């Protein structure tokens, strides 16, 4: 039996063309004029830039949540000029008198041994931190775990990351379907959006992760 490929509509083109009449995503989105075609290309360009923005946003959130929160360390400041001149100090000595070694101190003192302090520090570390967090090497290279948890699970943090990852996948697949129309203008709009997005937002992401880190997302 002979089956007509054109009975169910226009087949998808398998070669690149420069036509301004394309059907994008669904049947109602068909560009019939040059103005609608230009607006479609502008939308795809902005969508590619937005996809790069989502990748940078997720990276920034991951960096923010994985950085350890350290307490504020007070900065040491020099004393004021008036107080600086009031500190007693010998004329040829770079140190004030209260920092100099007293004359009654003997030079023939026993050498300082730090072994006992290192041992006590190690014991203190073992009691303070759980044993599963202290990785001691076993053998020349030591043992490594396959699954390492680097942060705690949180609805706010992990939920936001999951939504961003799902949105990136949705936008990435939409761009892929748009390029599969084999239209030269659509291809140039998507690639141009990727280039401009990397040019504007690439410095806010990790250098080793570009647009090619995940083919489905970009």
Curated annotation (Swiss-Prot):
GO molecular function terms listed in the Swiss-Prot or TrEMBL record: copper ion transmembrane transporter activity
Membrane spanning residue stretches: 37-57, 176-196
Keyword Nucleotidyltransferase on entry: no
Gene Ontology CC annotations of this record: plasma membrane
Reactions catalysed according to its record: Cu(2+)(in) = Cu(2+)(out)
Function, as annotated: Putative copper transporter; part of the crm gene cluster that mediates the biosynthesis of a yet unidentified copper-responsive metabolite. Probably involved in the transport of copper, even if it does not act as a major copper transporter. In contrast to crmA, is not involved in the biosynthesis of fumivalines or fumicicolins.
Name listed for the protein in its UniProt record: Putative copper transporter crmD
Species, as recorded: Aspergillus fumigatus (strain ATCC MYA-4609 / CBS 101355 / FGSC A1100 / Af293)
Species classification: Eukaryota, Fungi, Dikarya, Ascomycota, Pezizomycotina
Gene: crmD
């Amino acid at each position: 039996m002979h089956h007509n490929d054109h009975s169910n509509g226009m087949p998808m083109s398998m070669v690149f063309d420069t036509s301004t009449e394309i059907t994008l995503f669904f049947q109602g989105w068909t560009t019939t004029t040059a103005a609608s075609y230009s607006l479609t290309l502008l939308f795809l360009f902005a969508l590619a830039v937005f996809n790069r923005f989502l990748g940078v946003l997720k990276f920034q959130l991951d960096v923010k949540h994985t950085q350890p929160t350290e307490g504020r360390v007070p900065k040491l400041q020099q004393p004021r000029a008036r107080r600086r001149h009031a500190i007693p100090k010998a004329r040829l000595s770079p140190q004030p008198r209260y920092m100099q070694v007293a004359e009654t101190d003997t030079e023939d003192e026993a050498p300082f041994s730090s072994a006992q302090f290192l041992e006590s520090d190690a014991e203190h570390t073992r009691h303070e931190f759980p044993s599963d967090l202290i990785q001691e090497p076993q053998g020349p290279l030591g043992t490594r775990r396959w699954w390492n948890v680097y942060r705690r699970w949180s609805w706010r943090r992990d939920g936001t990351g999951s939504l961003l990852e799902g949105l990136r996948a949705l936008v990435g697949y939409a761009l892929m379907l748009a390029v599969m129309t084999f239209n030269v203008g659509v291809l140039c709009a998507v690639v141009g959006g990727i280039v401009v997005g990397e040019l504007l937002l690439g410095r806010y992401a990790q250098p080793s992760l570009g647009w090619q880190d995940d083919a489905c997302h970009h």
